[in-house]
Structures are given as C-alpha cells and as structure tokens.
C-alpha cells in the first residue's frame, strides 16, 4: 500500500512541494508527511483534498460530463487524501468531489476552489495537411480519438503487479524543455486545443525510459501524435509518450522505472524531433 511518505513527483509539474493553495471548504489537513504532490488549484493543476481517517481506503470520484470518474486516493488509516487532476477547461470557482460511504447511502461532498490562470499563446508552422484535414484524415482522427478515450479511461490498482513504494518520477529523456504545458496553440494561424503536456527536445533515436513502474496499455501510430505509447501506473495515473521513432514494447509489457522502451522521433504533427510527455490523473491531463 501507499505510505504517507509516498511522493507524486515529476518534471511535468507534479513536484513534491508544500501545498500552494489550500481547499477553501475542506477540513484542515492532517499533519503533512515528508513529501506531497504540489497542490495548485488552477485549470490544468492538481487539488489535494483531505478525506479524513478510515480503516480502508475511501472511494472518491469526480463528475466529468455525464461520467463519474474514480480518483487516486493515497494515505493510510490515519488520514486519506484524494489527488484530483483539474481539467484545463475548468471554470474558476467552486468545485467538488464525491466520497462514497462504505455501507451505501448518499455520498459526502468535499468542496474546493479553482483559481483562474491565463496560459501563454504559442504560434507554430506545421504541414498544412495536419491543420486543414482531408475527409480521410478527419475520419482517421475521429477513430483514433475514440480509441484513445478508451485508453484514458484505464483505472487499475497495481498494473505493475505490486504496489509502488514511491511515486517519485524520473525524467524520461534528457533535453531542453521546448514547450510547456497549457500553451494556447495556434497552428498556421488557426487556434487549436491547448498543449496538454511537456515537450523535451532531443535527437531522433534518443532512448526514453519509464519514469515509474507501470504496464503498457497502448502502442500506436496516430495522425497527430505519431508513434505513441501509454503507460498505466495505477489508480488513474497514466503517462503518454508521443512523436516516437520506434516503440520497443507491446501492450501488456511491464516496465520498471528506468527501463528504456521507445525512442525520440519526429512523427505526427511536429516542427522537429522531441518527446511530448503527458501526465494524466482521472482522465485529465495535468501540469
């Protein structure tokens, strides 16, 4: 089980630091352990919500559209905490999660507040066919979008076969951070979806390693993302690796932290070779 010394740390923004923004309506936090995920309650950030003591890990969920999405809950019987990814499209203001009672009945609501954040804009020049899609490319994109939505819905307890002793992430590839999370993207003068990960510039063929133990849940070649691998690290914590030149794993393979499993490339919609690294919590890309 995850101990109170566990960390959720990554160069994609999930850094072990004291909470920066405390929930407005949640009860006071239990005594802080040595490390915690950074709590920054803004669109694209992470909320850290105390659930109180319980003999077993509570079941918590958040409403996304018409779906109740399960949440990552860490801690022990002394005090549990829900780690909530906040969508980039989240409106500032009050938000809440639901905690399901063990014996049934009405869920308990835990409220928190989302503060506004303005992300910068980035203008890029790419191949026109990746901006103004042909009917064939549009149909391909829609098929791939639906497939990856199923991948992103993955929620397992121990995908690597054992509980993680630590969630401390390592950098998957050395290199310069060439593009940040949340940038409002403008391709060839046309606004598109915000950037949902971190870009790390590196030469084609540079090995990429797993930041945590996990299981491969998807390997594919996609229109926008190019060569892509998804890893499942448990309880809705997924990582994504895009624009790859080679993918040396298959679905179901189990990786340990530091295992090389793919290589940097320039496939899909890109301006040059790099790794697009995404981190997802509760089906939400986070910084």
Describe these PLM feature segments.
Residues 9, 16-20, 186:
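A generic secondary-structure boundary signal that marks alpha-helix termini
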């Amino acid at each position: 089980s995850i101990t109170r010394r566990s960390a959720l740390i990554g160069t994609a923004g999930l850094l072990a630091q004291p909470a920066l923004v405390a929930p407005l309506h949640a009860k006071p936090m239990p005594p802080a352990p040595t490390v915690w995920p950074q709590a920054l309650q803004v669109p694209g950030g992470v909320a850290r919500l105390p659930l109180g003591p319980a003999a077993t890990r509570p079941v918590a969920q958040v409403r996304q559209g018409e779906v109740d999405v399960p949440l990552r809950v860490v801690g022990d019987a002394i005090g549990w905490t829900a780690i909530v990814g906040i969508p980039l499209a989240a409106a500032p203001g009050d938000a809440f999660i639901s905690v399901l009672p063990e014996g049934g009945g009405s869920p308990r609501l835990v409220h928190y507040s989302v503060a506004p954040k303005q992300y910068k804009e980035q203008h890029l020049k790419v191949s026109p066919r990746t901006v103004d899609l042909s009917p064939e490319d549009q149909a391909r994109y829609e098929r791939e979008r639906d497939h990856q939505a199923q991948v992103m819905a993955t929620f397992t307890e121990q995908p690597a076969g054992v509980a993680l002793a630590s969630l401390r992430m390592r950098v998957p590839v050395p290199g310069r951070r060439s593009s940040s999370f949340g940038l409002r993207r403008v391709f060839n003068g046309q606004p598109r979806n915000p950037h949902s990960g971190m870009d790390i510039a590196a030469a084609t063929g540079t090995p990429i390693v797993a930041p945590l133990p996990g299981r491969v849940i998807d390997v594919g070649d996609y229109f926008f993302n190019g060569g892509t691998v998804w890893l499942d690290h448990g309880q809705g914590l997924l990582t994504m690796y895009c624009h790859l030149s080679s993918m040396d794993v298959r679905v179901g393979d189990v990786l340990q932290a530091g295992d090389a499993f793919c290589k940097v490339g320039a496939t899909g919609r890109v301006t040059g070779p790099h790794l697009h690294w995404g981190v997802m919590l509760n089906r939400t890309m986070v910084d």
